[in-house]
């Protein structure tokens, strides 16, 4: 089993990559999963979990259920089970479950521990590590949330065998995001290797990238913003399509292409670099059609992005391959010209 230590000032924890070990707990544990994952993987977890008392809360599967109602269900289960400050929650699922359980545990009794057991590629390489938690609102994605680090993260590649191809590819989008912004060697590996032959190494490399970024910038003051490449556009697209048309990684792939259009127009990417990223997305079937129906409305809604300050939009844009820049004060006309390409 491989381990990655994430040494933060207030709370350090480990990410374990390998077969799920026996988890022995001296306290009560509330497991939260979704309706699909629970049927596939809950028995596997229960075989390996030894706790004072265990209860399971199952939420409907899908991004549209990452809301106040589901959060309330989790908290009600915690109260009914009489969890205390020494108890913990366990997130068994993808990014939706990881985000919600992290948030629920951060506000229950002003904060209790939780363990992440991510079952999708996207959650393993991104959502389960770093402490970002939250729920969606009609106004946008993850607009209500907190920073709350897990007690531990357990990644078992066996979970990925049950993923549909579409779900798997959505996770690859997040790997590409990190590679383009932080590691050109990972870009080269994705370009030249068959991912099936090096999946564990790529996951380990991706988690290492995120771990190093989080250690440097836990609360996203500067370098961690690079992990939001594609998200300014992508998360708005998710909201505009009611979280039904695209998976998160698919929307982020569209968002990365929009960001690349903007970077190209600003001279931050050469045409060769632009085409290189485009071809990498094509290799993993991450090219999707999307049409903006109302350009002005879409532009105005960009200001709900959490990175915006003083009515100034900020975009994470690739600066070549393997680096990024936080770009602001971009002329409105330049942004609108990019949006027109998608109209």
Swiss-Prot record:
GO molecular function annotations of the record: 3-dehydroquinate synthase activity; metal ion binding; nucleotide binding
Keywords: Amino-acid biosynthesis, Aromatic amino acid biosynthesis, Cobalt, Cytoplasm, Lyase, Metal-binding, NAD, Nucleotide-binding, Zinc
Keyword set includes Coiled coil: no
Positions annotated to bind NAD(+): 61-66, 95-99, 119-120, 132, 141, 159-162
Cofactor: NAD(+); Co(2+); Zn(2+)
Catalytic activity: 7-phospho-2-dehydro-3-deoxy-D-arabino-heptonate = 3-dehydroquinate + phosphate
Pfam families per UniProt: DHQ_synthase, DHQS_C
Pathway: Metabolic intermediate biosynthesis; chorismate biosynthesis; chorismate from D-erythrose 4-phosphate and phosphoenolpyruvate: step 2/7
Co-factor: note: Binds 1 divalent metal cation per subunit. Can use either Co(2+) or Zn(2+).
InterPro entries: Dehydroquinate_synthase, DHQ_synth_AroB, DHQ_synth_fam, DHQS/DOIS_N, DHQS_C
Gene Ontology annotations of biological process type: amino acid biosynthetic process; aromatic amino acid family biosynthetic process; chorismate biosynthetic process
Family from the record: Belongs to the sugar phosphate cyclases superfamily. Dehydroquinate synthase family.
PANTHER family: 3-DEHYDROQUINATE SYNTHASE, 3-DEHYDROQUINATE SYNTHASE, CHLOROPLASTIC
Task of the protein: Catalyzes the conversion of 3-deoxy-D-arabino-heptulosonate 7-phosphate (DAHP) to dehydroquinate (DHQ).
Full protein name: 3-dehydroquinate synthase
Lineage: Bacteria, Pseudomonadati, Campylobacterota, Epsilonproteobacteria, Campylobacterales
Gene designation: aroB
């Amino acid at each position: 089993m491989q381990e990655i230590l994430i040494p933060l000032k207030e709370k350090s924890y480990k990410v374990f990559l390998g077969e799920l070990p026996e988890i022995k707990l001296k306290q009560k544990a509330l497991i939260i999963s979704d309706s699909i994952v629970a049927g596939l993987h809950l028995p596997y977890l229960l075989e390996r979990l030894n706790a004072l008392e265990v209860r399971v809360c199952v939420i409907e599967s899908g991004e549209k259920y990452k809301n106040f109602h589901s959060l309330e269900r989790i908290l009600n289960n915690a109260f009914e089970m009489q969890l205390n400050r020494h108890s913990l929650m366990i997130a068994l699922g993808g990014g939706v479950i990881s985000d919600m359980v992290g948030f629920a545990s951060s506000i229950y009794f002003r904060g209790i521990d939780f363990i992440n057991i991510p079952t999708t590629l996207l959650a393993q390489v991104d959502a389960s590590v770093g402490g970002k938690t939250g729920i969606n609102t009609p106004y946008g994605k993850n607009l209500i949330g907190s920073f709350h680090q897990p007690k531990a993260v357990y990644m078992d590649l066996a979970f990925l065998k049950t993923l549909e191809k579409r779900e798997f590819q959505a996770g690859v989008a997040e790997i590409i995001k990190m590679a383009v912004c932080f590691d050109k060697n990972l870009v080269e590996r994705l370009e030249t290797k068959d991912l099936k032959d090096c999946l564990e190494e790529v996951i380990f490399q991706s988690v290492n990238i995120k771990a190093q970024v989080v250690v440097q910038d836990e609360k996203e003051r500067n370098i961690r913003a690079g992990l939001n490449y594609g998200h300014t556009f992508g998360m708005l697209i998710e909201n505009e399509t009611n979280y039904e048309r695209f998976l998160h990684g698919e929307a982020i792939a569209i968002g990365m292409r929009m960001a690349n259009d903007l970077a190209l127009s600003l001279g931050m990417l050469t045409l060769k670099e632009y085409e290189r990223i485009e071809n990498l997305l094509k290799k993993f079937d991450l090219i999707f059609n999307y049409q903006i129906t109302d350009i002005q409305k879409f532009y105005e809604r960009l200001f709900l992005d959490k990175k915006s300050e003083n009515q100034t939009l900020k975009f994470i844009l690739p600066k070549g391959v393997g680096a990024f820049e936080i770009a602001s004060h971009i002329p409105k006309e330049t942004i609108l010209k990019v949006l027109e390409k998608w109209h």
